[in-house]
C-alpha cells in the first residue's frame, strides 16, 4: 500500500491505523482523519527512514554516475537543512501538498536530515532481522551486505 492508498484507507475508515513517513501523518491529522500517536523515532532511535539506494548493476556498470548521485544527495541534504522554508516550498510544489501542512510536518517530524550511512547501519541491520523473522526475506542481512559506503567516503573525503 502506498502512502496515498494508506491516507485514503484511513480517511475512508477502512483501516484503524497506518504507519507512514512524513508529511502523511500531518496530512491525516490536519484533514481530521486521525491523530499522531507515536513518532517513528520513539519506536526505534536512529531508524532508517528515507534512504538513497542504488542497484548493484549501476554500481558495477556506472560507478561514476553513482559517485555523482551521492555527491548530489549530500549537497541537496545540506541545502535542505540550511533552507528549510525553500525546501518546503519545493516539496509542496512538486507534490501539490499544502505548503503549511509541509511546514508543520517538518516541525513535527522527529527525524534528522543525514547523509552519513554509518548513522543508520544498526537500524538497517535490525530491520533486516525483523523482516527475516516475519518471513519476508530468506535470511537476515549483515551491515556489509546492506551497505557500500565507499561512494560516501570518497565524496566526503574530497570536500
What are these regions (language model features)?
Residues 4-93:
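Pocket-lining segment of extracytoplasmic ligand-binding domains
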Residues 60-138:
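Secondary-structure end/capping motifs
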Residues 129-159:
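Conserved C-terminal helix/tail region of periplasmic/extracytoplasmic solute-binding proteins
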Amino acid at each position: 500500500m502506498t502512502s496515498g492508498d494508506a491516507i485514503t484507507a484511513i480517511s475512508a475508515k477502512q483501516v484503524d491505523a497506518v504507519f507512514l513517513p512524513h508529511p502523511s501523518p500531518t496530512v491525516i491529522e490536519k484533514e481530521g482523519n486521525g491523530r499522531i500517536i507515536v513518532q517513528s523515532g520513539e519506536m526505534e532511535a536512529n531508524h532508517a527512514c528515507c534512504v538513497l539506494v542504488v542497484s548493484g548493476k549501476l554500481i558495477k556498470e556506472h560507478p561514476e554516475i553513482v559517485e555523482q548521485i551521492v555527491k548530489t544527495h549530500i549537497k541537496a541534504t545540506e541545502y535542505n537543512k540550511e533552507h528549510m522554508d525553500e525546501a518546503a516550498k519545493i516539496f509542496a510544489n512538486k507534490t501539490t501538498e499544502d505548503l503549511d501542512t509541509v511546514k508543520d510536518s517538518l516541525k513535527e517530524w522527529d527525524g534528522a536530515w543525514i547523509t552519513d550511512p554509518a548513522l543508520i547501519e544498526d537500524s538497517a541491520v535490525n530491520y533486516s532481522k525483523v523482516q527475516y523473522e516475519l518471513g519476508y526475506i530468506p535470511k537476515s542481512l549483515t551491515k556489509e551486505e546492506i551497505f557500500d559506503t565507499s561512494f560516501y567516503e570518497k565524496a566526503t573525503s574530497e570536500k
